[in-house]
Every structure is written in C-alpha cells, then in structure tokens.
Amino acid sequence: MVSSYPLPDGFSEFDVFSLGSCLLVEGLLGILLNAVTIISFFKIRELRTPSNFLVVSLAMADIGISMNATVAGFSSFLRYWPYGSDGCQLHGFQGFTTALASIHFVAAIAWDRYHQYCTRTKLQWSSAITLAIFVWLFCAMWSAFPLIGWGEYDYEPLRTCCTLDYSKGDRNYTSYLIPMSIFNMGIQIFVVMSSYQSIAQKFKKTGNPRFNPNIPLKTLLLCWGPYGIMSFYAVFENATLVSPKLRMIAPILAKTAPTIDAFLYALGNENYRGGIWQFLTGEKIEVPQIENKSK
C-alpha cells in the first residue's frame, strides 16, 4: 500500500501528489501530441518531406521523454521507485538519450530553417536520414558513459525517477559534465541562436515574417536551462544543500519540452498543421509553399 512507504526527505504528501500529477499530465499530453505528429507524417503524403522528417524525429525523441515522465509520475503516486537499481539505470539512460536527442533535433530544425529562408536551399532525404542516425547514435554514446563509470545515474530528489547524478560533484562527474555539455548543449544553443538571428534579419528585410524567430531559443533555455544551471552549480558547490523542492523544478520544466515542441514545430508550422488537420478531419487545407532550390 502507498501508506507503507515513507515520504521522500523534504517533501510533504501534497508535494509528492502535486509533482507526481505534473509529471503524469506532462507525460500523457506529450505522448498524445507527439503521437499525432508522428502518425500524421506517415499518413499524409504531403507531409513526408526531408524537413518534416526532422520534425518527426524531434517528436520521436520527445515521446521518449514523455514516456519517461509518465513512469516517473506513476512511481510518485507509489512514493518509491518500484523497478530496482537496474530499472533506475535504464530509466536514466533512456531519459538522457531522448533528452539529448531532443536538443539536437531542435538545433537541426534551426539549421534547416536557416537554409530554407536565408540560402533558399532544400534539405535532401539523404542528408536528413544521415543526420537523424548520427544524432541518435551520438546521444546514445554519451548516455551510455554513465553506465560504464564515467558519470553516474541516480535518483532525482523525489526518488521516483532517475537521471544524471549531480549530488557528488566530484572529479569523475566534472570530467564528464563539461565535454558532454559542450557537445550536447553548447554547440546546439549556438546553432539555434545564430540560425534564428539570421532568419530574423531576413524577415526584417522582406517584411514577411513566417513565424517568430525569437521563440525557439527562449523555449530551449526555459526547458533545459535549469538543468544546466543545477548541473554546473554542483561542480562548485554542494548541490544537496539546495532545497529538494527547488531541485525538482529542473525535471518538471524539462518534461514540458515535448508539449512545447509539439506546439512550436508541428502545430505552429502552417504546413505541418495543415497535414495534422487533414489527418484528424479528412479536410485538406492549401498553404503557401516556400520557394526553394536544390543544391
């Protein structure tokens, strides 16, 4: 029974229920929205383009994050992690792989949009597929290192989900965190920032903005910035001295990424939105196309 398991340190009954409910809602909503994004891609022929393949690849990564959140939400209602140490390692690996992949695909979409709007060149299928394969393998590689001793997976403060352990802040953790962050966050932030800055300048010249180029970077930093701050804080200070409730803000915000991405890159994309509408209702909507040229 739930009552037989003690509350995690620093959390009340209400805290555990509220955080568990947030994780469960985030997980189920993310699964629903990204499942619609993925199914629409395969059902509607007009959506099956190389650029949209990056969007559906992002949705696949995000649905993985949402599944991770759903498991964490369910465990929160139990008040404990029911899957043992091996389950914790698997949960950490799966969550970290999909999180890194999500960040990479956000950067890939920014890079593709830069070429669409600024250089008027079209992404080819071979490039899109190669890029997606590289992203998944690269992210899986970095996520596998903690399984073999470089870095470590352990419980979040709520002790009902697992992630990269920042509580120790030792040399092993620091030596892993710095290169991992550079190759899986720093470069991606630079790509997103520079790509959308160029797009914003292009929109300003043409006077025909197709979307708000300031939003993608802001949402990326909103979702993943708190994790980055806490991770680097642990390099210099004892992160366990920070309130457990405050430390749980990072995973809660991170798991909003799948829902935000679905609205931003699928429902917020007039071409993709039209395909989703056609899938759901059978009604086809004609949208203006970007004039591209192949390399």
Per-segment meaning from a language model:
Residues 2-9, 80-97, 128, 140-186:
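Loop architecture of class A 7-transmembrane GPCRs
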Residues 222-231, 248-291:
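Seventh transmembrane helix
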Residues 31-42, 66-70, 97-120, 131-133, ...:
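Cytoplasm-facing ends of alpha-helical transmembrane segments in multi-pass membrane proteins
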Residues 1-7, 205-211, 215, 270-295:
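Intrinsically disordered regulatory tails of 7TM GPCRs
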Residues 27, 57-69, 131-143, 181-189, ...:
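Alpha-helical transmembrane segments of multi-pass membrane proteins
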Residues 1-32, 168:
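Extracellular N-terminal segment of 7TM GPCRs
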